[in-house]
Amino acid sequence: MGTPLLRFSARPVRRRLLGTLGPALLAGALLAGGQAGAAYAAAGTDATPTASAPSVQLPEAQPSSAQLPPDGDTVASPPGANDWSCKPTAAHPDPVVLVHGTFANRYENWLALSPLLKSKGYCVFALDYGTVPGVTSSGSGLLLPIGGLGPADRSAAQLGRFVDLVRAATGAAKVDLVGHSQGGMLPNYYLKFLGGAAEVDKVVGLAPSNHGTTLDGITKLAPYFPGAADLIYTACNACRDQAVGSAFNQKMASVPDTVPGVRYTVISTVYDEVVTPYRTQFLSGPNVDNVVLQDSCPVSLAEHVAIAFSPTALHLVANALDPAHATPAFCG
């Protein structure tokens, strides 16, 4: 059964992303990122982007977790990720698993971080989760799911299965998890309720929805992701799960923010307009570093989406993964 389409016009987005991405990275996003890359470019100008939602046929049933794709699938991986022959080194014994956000996919979300970590010698892996059959983005000519839609608890279970695949392929005892937005929050559910604490060494969240947000905040993602406005109130169970006061968030709040033995880093931006107030992203616990991007780069205008492409934020991620070799993170 088809779902009535919602038309939307994005509000003007301030000139933030160009100063954050840099010309080379922005060009790469445009060439490789398809629709989301084009949205990032539009957000970096004073133009008011408008979009007409594509015709999307949604299934009658509520979305459920997608099956993990087999090796050699046609779903695009970001540069540097999903080399299943990669073996961790003594310098970086924990593979890094990248977890994208709501309305996103592994390819577009991690165009910047994945190749950076690969160049530093990490084994890097990235999954797509929470997808709905038939809901895809094809602006780049690749099969790009619109992910992060399914029930958050099922997506966390899907993350757990992917971690098991990575550990089996690499021989690693544990992994490090790096997530953006919803992808920064899901590891917490996996650790708290699905036995992930024994399999994870570090968790790094970029603008994570750790304690929920408002549906109004989630709608502010729509200008960046063509078709998202159609999905917020139809196929996006994760949107409702991330709302403050949801049953999912009540369960998350019923236990402490963190589990023993895992090191957490939260990287937030004062300009976050999606997960608000931004300090609600912070975690409480003795094993937590809560970091504000502008403390390292006061002039950074990176907001909720751009933080995943901010050179300063990515430097902070690298420091969190390898604190013994951390270096000062400045602008640029």
Report each predicted region and the residues it spans.
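Secretory targeting and sorting signals
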Residues: 1-42
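Composition-driven, intrinsically disordered low-complexity tracts enriched in small residues
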Residues: 39-81, 86-88, 168, 211, ...
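Active-site catalytic motif of lipid deacylating hydrolases and related acyltransferases
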Residues: 58-74, 82-174, 221
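Extracellular/periplasmic catalytic domains that process cell-envelope and extracellular macromolecules
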Residues: 88-92, 117-119, 169-170, 178-179, ...
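Hydrophobic/aromatic beta-strand patches that form the interior of the parallel beta-sheet core
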Residues: 97, 125, 204, 265-267, ...
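Serine-dependent carboxylesterase/thioesterase catalytic core
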Residues: 100, 124, 147, 152-252
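Short aromatic-enriched loop/helix-cap "lid" or pocket-rim segments at secondary-structure transitions
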Residues: 136-140, 213-219, 276-280, 302-303
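C-terminal catalytic-base region of ester-bond hydrolases, centering on the histidine
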Residues: 225, 259-332
